Structure formats: C-alpha cells, structure tokens
Amino acid sequence: MSAEKGELDLNGAKQNTGMWLVKLPKYLAQQWAKATGRGEVGKLRIVKNQGKTEVSFTLNEELASIQDIGGKPASSLVSTPREHPFLLQSVGGQTLTVLTESLSGQSEDKSENRVIDKLALEGIVVHRAECRPAASDNYMQMKRKQIEESSKPKRQSQQLEKAVTSNYKPVSNHQYNIEYEKKKKDDGKRARVDKHQVLDMLFSAFEKHQYYNIKDLVDITKQPVTYLKEILRDIGIYNMKGTHKNTWELKPEYRHYQGEDKSD
C-alpha cells in the first residue's frame, strides 16, 4: 500500500470524545452489513446491577435470518441469536484512538495508490468489550449448520447419463499423452552402444559443424541423454554463456577444423 500524508484533524481529541472498542462475532458483522434504511441494527442496553455495569446488545428481528453460511446458501432457515451480552475489559493502561480517513485517487484495488486527503482523530478508547452470543437454541442450531456446511466437500462427483459434447468431445487419449508416450517409448529404444562407436559419430558430426545442442546430438547418435553427456564431458566443452549458449563444442585438443589446419 502506498499512501500520501494529508491533514490531521484533532477535534476528537480536543472534545475528549470517549469511544468503545468492541469485538464482534463474524456472523453478527455480516448481518449488520445487510441493514437498510436508516441502518438501525439493534438496541444497546446499559444497566447498573448492584453497582456493576452490565451491557447487552439485541439484534433487530429482521436481521436475525441467515441466508447463507460460509458463503454458501443455507439449506434451511437459520436464525442468529438476538441477545448478545458484553464482556467488559479494561483498556489496560494503553492509549488507543479511533481514526477515520477520507481518500481520493483510489484505484479499484483499494490496497494501491491510496491518497489520504484528511485523517481525523474521532476519539480515545475508554472501554473495551467483547460481544458474545447468549447460549440459546438459535445459537446451537446456527453452529450445527456451520459445521455441517464446512464438512461438505467443495467438489462433488456426478455420474453423467450421456456424454457432454457441447464443448469437448470425448477421446480415447489426449494428444499430449500420445506424444509423451511416444517420446518415452523412443527413449527406451535407445540402447547404449560401445563408447568408441559413439565417439566416431560425435567426431564425424563436429567435422561438419562446430556447435551442437544436446537434442541434435541425441538425434544423431540415438543414445540416452545421460550416457551421451558422460562421453561429451571427456571430449567437449559446454558453453553456458555467449553467442553459442547451451551448446557443446569439442575441446581444443580434439578439433580438426580446416581453419585451424591452415593457421598451423
């Protein structure tokens, strides 16, 4: 993420606005996102019980119905628990703040090319809490459905009564497999011959051309690649860079080119 600095609005700090930092269950946040109209999602209740503060949240009834679980449509009607008591926690000596930002020049990918016009400090966290579902039949049913959906295989096999020919026609074997099997069969036919015979074939080839790649030498000698490389290491040099990169040539002591004969 690339972000450019903008103005910092500290009105929230000046007003000493207290904020609550509350951890929500994932399903509850998803239900909140479905709120329409004024965006009212429920009611927050704060009471004093024997000098102790008790906080609970009640979800609106119209948001309690779950249409999908884990990104998949729910197979049956499932309702979330509506009652959620808060577990209050201390801030623990930390100074936590809530910031908001307004962006411009933002691309479709929100993680890139972010330009922050304005950064505002809305307030300071004075309470931390965890919003937990109350134990109920709805909650147990929802968790049971989540477990059932997560245990279903992502892909299922299905037996077709007739062949699908709209896109691909069935074949006994694919061309790639045919070529691979042919190559494998040809390689198996390459039986090792005497080393001196291979050397004769190699010297004869290098009299015609100075450089060869390994594929051409395999075609010429009809020898397995590993066996051929063992022999080439004795008489040849493998070029790893330059104009003739990835090719073999004879070592100087084995060369008998016409140009060298004239220079001698």
UniProtKB/Swiss-Prot annotation:
Pfam families membership: TFIIF_beta, TFIIF_beta_N
Primary location: nucleus
Function text: TFIIF is a general transcription initiation factor that binds to RNA polymerase II and helps to recruit it to the initiation complex in collaboration with TFIIB.
Highest taxon, organism lineage: Eukaryota
Transmembrane regions: none
GO BP annotation list: transcription by RNA polymerase II; transcription initiation at RNA polymerase II promoter
PANTHER family assigned: GENERAL TRANSCRIPTION FACTOR IIF SUBUNIT 2
Protein name: General transcription factor IIF subunit 2
Compartments (UniProt record): Nucleus
Keywords: DNA-binding, Nucleus, Transcription, Transcription regulation
This protein's GO CC annotations: transcription factor TFIIF complex
Subunit-structure text: Heterodimer of an alpha and a beta subunit.
Family: Belongs to the TFIIF beta subunit family.
GO terms for MF: DNA binding
UniProt keyword annotation of Transmembrane present: no
